[in-house]
């Protein structure tokens, strides 16, 4: 995939997450590695709702902007540096997505990995980690980010208590779908907890063994590409401005 197509894919993922109610203000970044020491990442400023390919910067792993559209301000904030550290520590990770989905943020306050209650959540069974014992403010230094990077070297999804979530993948669309699945799992945990409290009934989670077995079975279904195509069809209806640029021809 060429750089223009990668930039558009980042924007499509961001726009869809916004449409799905999974972004907060202009917080959140999506990055994808393009060389040994550089990545594409959205600049700070525009929200996921309005992101365009011109908002995507080429940044090295020290946070230096190497290329940017001359029409935009190439401001690099602490969160972009967070992505750089994660990529530097984990060269095997292609894409990194960080945002603040409401259910994931809510569930993260319990400092607990969500239970698996449904078939879809089995796809991410055993893939979720919790980082930090408590919220310690913005992760603005490499010492603070290192635990995130180390956790993501072992698990592709991480909950940041009282903050948000980070998902990774072999490409942007995989990281995005994992974020959607994580948000769904957290939402169901919240709903199940509320139902249990209201009814006095005891919920039953899917056992770890059964969840992992279902995960293996679901992995045989090639759902990602048709799902991504469905997302694009929806975006062409809801966000036609994103597909009027020259890079849209590569989507």
Region locations from a protein language model:
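Glycine-rich flexible loops
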Residues: 1-251
């Amino acid at each position: 995939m060429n750089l223009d197509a990668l930039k558009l894919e980042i924007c499509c993922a961001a726009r869809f997450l916004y449409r799905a109610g999974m972004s907060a203000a202009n917080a959140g970044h999506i990055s994808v590695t393009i060389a040994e020491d550089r990545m594409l990442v959205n600049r700070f400023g525009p929200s996921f709702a309005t992101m365009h390919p011109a908002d995507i910067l080429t940044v090295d792993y020290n946070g230096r902007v190497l290329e940017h559209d001359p029409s935009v301000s190439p401001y690099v904030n602490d969160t972009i540096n967070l992505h750089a550290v994660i990529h530097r520590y984990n060269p095997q990770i292609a894409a990194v997505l960080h945002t603040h989905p409401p259910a994931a943020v809510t569930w993260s306050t319990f400092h607990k990995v969500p239970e698996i209650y449904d078939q879809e959540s089995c796809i991410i069974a055993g893939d979720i980690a919790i980082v930090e014992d408590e919220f310690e403010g913005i992760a603005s230094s490499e010492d603070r980010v290192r635990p995130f990077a180390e956790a993501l070297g072992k698990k592709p999804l991480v909950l940041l208590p009282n903050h948000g979530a980070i998902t990774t993948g072999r490409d942007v669309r995989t990281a995005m779908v994992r974020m959607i699945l994580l948000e769904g799992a957290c939402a169901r945990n919240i709903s199940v907890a509320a139902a249990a409290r209201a009814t006095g009934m005891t919920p039953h989670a899917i056992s770890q063994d059964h969840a992992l077995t279902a995960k293996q079975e679901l992995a045989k279904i090639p759902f990602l590409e048709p799902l991504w195509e469905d997302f694009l069809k929806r975006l062409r209806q809801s966000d036609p401005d994103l597909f009027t640029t020259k890079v849209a021809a590569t989507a």
